Design a protein with these regions (language model features):
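Gly/charged, well-structured mid-domain segments that form the phosphate/adenylate-handling core
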Residues: 197, 210-212, 243-279, 283
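Glycine/aspartate-rich loop-and-adjacent alpha/beta segment that forms the canonical ThDP
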Residues: 382-403
Length: 403
């Protein structure tokens, strides 16, 4: 890895954070390619050491030579210990820090400590940080690296959920933070009434944000438009834009890139199967799941929903986080059906029962999908956690190819 990464001609980006890494990293890669650059990228989201090594090996020729101007590498937070000792990133994009996989990461402070230790080992690495996240912003300020910020300075949507908020207390002094508004989870405009810690000035500020059938916002007098749903995708797009601009590009081809961008990795991936529109998305922690639900419920037409929950090692065995998700938001009139599947389908069904949401149980994921395509309303959303993602995507690709 050290040998191959040293052959990157210009700069190396790493993308870290709890949610949005894969989408942000792939958009960043596509944006750099739109600027005419050759880029190495771990597109599938394989973000531990083996996945990072594989991205560089697959990008190399048989001679061991790498032909790349840039590298865009998504890195699992805990894996930075192994990756940062072998490559020297020029930029780090920090998306957010939420509670995730408690039995693997433990408390969020452990993740922050790992990141800070590794960031300090690369003191000249510039951090492109979500300034609306008090945890990420504190980390960027505290580690001593140069940093720029991106964020959304005005409230966009009314925050009605009773979400678990991770960054409630000031990391500097322990005082409870005061928020003038929340976007979602702990993202918003915050300040500490005791020590003065506050949301930093935002360098890349999204204004006039619209989140309807598509996303639109203005940054640096440039109107950005993307055919995506979900408020959280404003942050993903904004992070990629901030990365490209920080690297010195004018981002003149950014909207063109967004029009052509196709994730093809189970993140908001769309399929058309026998007349049914299918959207597959990853939901692996409370903050991410709540944003997924909000995006699904933006669609006012009747819909079927399949939720697939596993508890394999990569998911985390502890699925108590399901009780911190606002599943009561699925109580709208336009829900035709909800089916639960996966290893922990019984737990998922119980969780829905506690908020009076009726559901059907089908242990086999393919059977569940075939049933909804066969007798559903023609509009299907499939929400899965990590180890269910690739198997479910393969099923959907297979069904899409059937005549």
């Amino acid at each position: 890895l050290e040998e191959l990464s040293s052959q990157v001609r210009e700069k190396i980006f790493v993308v870290c954070g709890t949610n949005g890494k894969t989408t942000t990293n792939n958009m960043l890669c596509a944006g750099l390619e739109a600027e005419g650059k050759k880029v190495i990228c771990n597109h599938t989201g394989s973000n531990m050491l083996n996945g990072v090594v594989a991205a560089f090996v697959l990008g190399a020729k048989f001679s061991g030579k790498l032909d790349a101007d840039y590298a865009c590498i998504e890195v699992d937070e805990a894996s930075t210990r192994h990756v940062f000792t072998r490559i020297r990133p020029d930029y780090m994009v920090m998306t957010n820090l939420f509670r995730d996989q408690l039995d693997r990461y433990g408390e969020i402070d452990i993740t922050m400590n790992i990141l800070e230790e590794m960031m300090k080992k690369v003191p000249d690495m510039k951090v492109i940080v979500n300034g609306d996240d008090a945890l990420s912003a504190y980390l960027a300020m505290d580690c001593g690296n140069p940093f720029v910020t991106y964020g959304i300075s005005k409230p966009v949507i009314e925050n009605k959920t009773n979400e678990i908020r991770e960054g409630r207390f000031c990391k500097c002094c322990g005082e409870r933070l005061i928020y003038s508004f929340y976007h979602y989870s702990q993202l918003g405009d915050y300040r500490c009434p005791k020590c003065g810690f506050k949301r930093p000035e935002i360098d890349f500020d999204a204004t006039d944000v619209k989140v309807d059938d598509q996303i639109a916002f203005t940054v640096e007098d440039k109107r950005i438009v993307a055919n995506y749903k979900g408020f959280y995708n404003v942050y993903n797009i904004l992070a990629a834009y901030a990365g490209i601009r920080t690297a010195g590009f004018k981002a003149e081809h950014f909207n063109e890139m967004l029009r052509k961008f196709n994730p093809e990795n189970g993140r908001n991936e769309q399929f058309r199967i026998k007349g049914t529109s299918v959207v597959l998305n990853l939901a692996k922690n409370p903050a991410g799941f709540n944003q997924n639900i909000s995006a699904v419920m933006q669609d006012g037409s009747p819909k079927d929903i399949i939720i697939v929950i596993n508890d394999n090692a990569q998911d985390g065995k502890d699925i108590s986080w399901l009780w911190d998700v606002d599943f009561d938001l699925f109580g709208g009139d336009n829900i035709n059906s909800i089916t639960v599947s996966g290893i922990r389908c019984q737990d998922m069904r119980l969780r829905l029962k506690y908020v009076d949401i009726p559901s059907m149980l089908e242990n086999d994921v393919e059977t569940a999908i075939r049933k909804r395509i066969g007798d559903g309303c023609g509009n299907l959303y499939v929400l899965v956690n990590y180890t269910a993602l690739f198997g479910t995507r393969n099923i959907l690709k297979k069904l899409e190819g059937e005549k």
